[in-house]
Amino acid sequence: DVCSSDLIAMIMGLVLPTSGSVSVLGAKIPEQRYDVLGRMNFESPYVDMPMRLTVRQNLTIFGRLYAVEQLRERIDQLAVDLDLKEFLDRSNGKLSAGQKTRVALAKALINEPDLLLLDEPTASLDPDTADWVRQHLETYRKTHNATILLASHNMLEVERLCDRVIIMKRGKIQDDDSPERIMARYNRDTLEEVFLDVARGRVREGAPEDAP
């Protein structure tokens, strides 16, 4: 069964689909993945950066991988935007969980991607830090006209950040629409309630008899 993390891996060309095809930013994946990798980036709390390197060193490495022009200035700007200045020259292994979250977001934004892939970006974060992440994601999306693909079990987060929602269960799409239309179709007030209905196999009055 395909999970949301597998979907992200397929978009990045790291996993091949068993059937069908993948097209991202006008490019066929994986055949043309290197044509568009520079326009994408990825962030997950489950992927850590080298512990012994400083924040600046880590961002420099990733910036060079993405061939970022004026890299030093870009890192300095991210340090201001994401409040990294106090620990920019501290090793990653000595950072708090909240500081690591800021660095991970800086890494994901280092190349100003057109497509930002996020796998449970606020998992295990305290409410204040999670809200901070969401605010910055909203700001980035609006200021850069970027597309964000978010894989999350946090339906409050999905409602806040997403214009289009795809609900998956055991690798199959159960619904695909705007949050408002999905909630109306299931006669529910929140996506959390819809998510629980789908997970538990319930079909509410007004919900689709056959998933799309």
State where each predicted segment sits.
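Short, small-residue-biased leader/transition segments that mark boundaries at the very start
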Residues: D1-S4
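ABC ATPase "signature
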Residues: D176-D177
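Conserved ABC ATPase "signature" region
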Residues: T60, R64-F87
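Conserved catalytic motifs of ABC-family nucleotide-binding domains
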Residues: E112
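Catalytic Walker B motif of ABC-type/P-loop ATPase nucleotide-binding domains
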Residues: L116-D119
